[in-house]
Amino acid sequence: MLHIRSWTLPKSSCSTLIWNRGFSKAPVLQVAKVIAVQDKKINLDREKHIQRIQERIEKIPISNYRNFSIVAHVDHGKSTLSDRLLELTGVIQPGAANKQVLDKLDVERERGITIKAQTCTMFYHDTNTKEDYLLHLVDTPGHVDFRAEVSRSYASCGGALLLVDAAQGVQAQTVANFYLAYSMGLKLIPIINKIDLDAADIPRAMDQVETTFELNREDCIPVSAKTGLNVENIIPSIINNIPPPQGDINKPLKALLVDSWHDPYVGVVMLVHIVDGKMKKGMKLLSAHTSKKYEVKEVGVMYPDKTPMDVLRAGQVGYIIPGMKNPREALIGDTFFQNGQHENLEPLPGFEEPKPMVFVGAFPADGGEFKVMNDHMENLVLNDRSVTLEKETSNALGLGWRLGFLGSLHASVFKERLEKEYGAKIILTAPTVPYKIVYKDGTEKVITNPDEFPGADQRALNIDHLMEPYVKAIMTIPDEYIGVVMSLCENNRGIQNEMEYLNTGQVLLKYELPLAQLVEDFFGKLKGATKGYASLDYEDSGYKKSDIVKMELCVSGIPQDALSQVMHRSQVQSRGKEYVARFKEYLKSQLFEVAIQAKVNNKVVARETIKAKRKDVTQRLHAADISRRKKLLERQKEGKKQMKASGRVHINHEAYQAFLRRSD
């Protein structure tokens, strides 16, 4: 009897596992031949498919290229609209299996956000002019934490679709990304999405587009990305309004790095926009910013997955495999030249290395899993060069890491990916931001760890002042909540810059806020104050002089390094009382009295006391034996004094975990 067990692999490979239990090999060979024929047929079909795509691209002039992006607030339907456009151009088939095609990460699909920039090549045949067009959709992140990907993606585009929810109207992220796209010279096409909703108010959304962005309401295209209604009107508008790329295939190669990711089999895969010239397999590349050299192993387009091509031409957005082993060499916004033909060529403008703005300590929940967790951490960092990773040691939590992120959402996504993809359990300390120390001699130092914060004696001797980072926050709220939101901003040390009433019952508020306040769940408080109707976006606003101090949490006089925090002096009293009261909940009683103190510059600002356990040493005494009773109680009291002087409080690992978990 022949037993055959098989499973489905990707189309490029067909594999079957066969066991023959002592019988004739002839049936096995016949099955193997069938499989070989099927494999060959699949490969031939794929080669023909690739050849057809390649031939079609070759026939399209650069004047018929259109590179575009989609500007939208979170959950306004950007990924859904991308799916409809891919279906409309025949890249994918309609169906639930092809949902959020350009969101490759699980966390992107679950949260409904885009984290990594992606692209897809599409063909469109204009039935009126009988011409073919090559479209490149560059799907960008919308959140400010991933602004590096956004700006580089916009740099590869000639225009963008400005997506507005017909029910919610213009939101903060829409405004922030509009200004970024507008400042980069992109042609914007307003799209009013979700017109199928009962709450949709199309005229109101059009009014907001006209008043907020000064775009003609007549240019708005009302669509439903969910049902596909009117989506077919978008591509003709793209062709008629968005200009083609201005590249020249005959000039020396100049390519912009839009994004990159790490593939365990081929190394780094880079998403590039060919500005001038062409790129093909075997070409030697030179990085403008690292001066490192690479040899191209493969070039291709995303259709929607990697599809190898012979060449990428000026104007195209595609992928290359450069033989790069270290992902940290792939710098977003870097320019690549052909080695030997780069003399007198200037790198493309706008390159800026992403700077981490939120730092946390990370420790394994089980200290014995540090080595395994370290491997997981390094693997994840391979795919995200904007994360900084350094090992550190805590007296309280043991071995761990100091991680730097672009923002609080970035940190949250990283933690979620670590837990979901590797099953890791991790503890994050309270987030801190990069503070700046300005010394009396004019030199500066940036600190990202509370342990590096100078003591009172050091500050008095050679430090002139301290500075903290600020951000420009943009909020859109219903006008009925304006009072409570302004109070929230002022309580978080905000400085009002601008207030604009939109003509639809919405208010646009612009505040300067300390970044430290923003990462402490400011958005959660904003949502709570407005019953979920507020939206928020922000951008860097530089450093301002500030009265910053370090608060230590001490148990029996011993500082707990993992619980130290840097904050503004105005927060010390309230935060100190809150911390000592909360930490008291997780400590067990000792045989001696335990003091939990919050200290600033060695001065106690808040205190809680855990009373000592008491053993009844008089239980066997006769009621009338008063002198003996006093003697035993005095001896017990003296013993507890000695224990308090020499004893050390043992704090369970679980106490730190519980306290920090509540601080998240």
Swiss-Prot record:
Enzyme Commission number = 3.6.5.-
User: Where in or outside the cell is it found?
Assistant: Mitochondrion inner membrane
GO annotation, cellular component aspect: mitochondrial inner membrane; mitochondrial matrix
Instruction: Summarize where GTP binds, as residue positions.
Output: 72-79, 139-143, 193-196
* Domain tr-type G residues, every copy: 63-246
Q: What Pfam families does the record point to?
A: EFG_C (PF00679), GTP_EFTU (PF00009), GTP_EFTU_D2 (PF03144), LepA_C (PF06421)
Q: Which reaction does it catalyse?
A: GTP + H2O = GDP + phosphate + H(+)
Q: Which GO terms describe its molecular function?
A: GTP binding; GTPase activity; mitochondrial ribosome binding
Q: Mainly resides where?
A: mitochondrion
Q: How does it sit in the membrane?
A: Peripheral membrane protein
Q: List the disulfide bonds.
A: none
- Nucleotide-binding as a keyword of this entry, yes or no, is yes
- Which keywords are on file for this protein? GTP-binding, Hydrolase, Membrane, Mitochondrion, Mitochondrion inner membrane, Nucleotide-binding, Protein biosynthesis
The Gene Ontology biological process annotation of the record reads:
positive regulation of translation; translation
What HAMAP family does this protein map onto? LepA
This molecule's function is given as: Promotes mitochondrial protein synthesis. May act as a fidelity factor of the translation reaction, by catalyzing a one-codon backward translocation of tRNAs on improperly translocated ribosomes. Binds to mitochondrial ribosomes in a GTP-dependent manner.
Q: What else is known?
A: This protein may be expected to contain an N-terminal transit peptide but none has been predicted.
Please give the family membership noted in the entry.
Belongs to the TRAFAC class translation factor GTPase superfamily. Classic translation factor GTPase family. LepA subfamily.
Report the protein name in the record: Translation factor GUF1, mitochondrial
Q: Which organism is it from?
A: Clavispora lusitaniae (strain ATCC 42720) (Yeast)
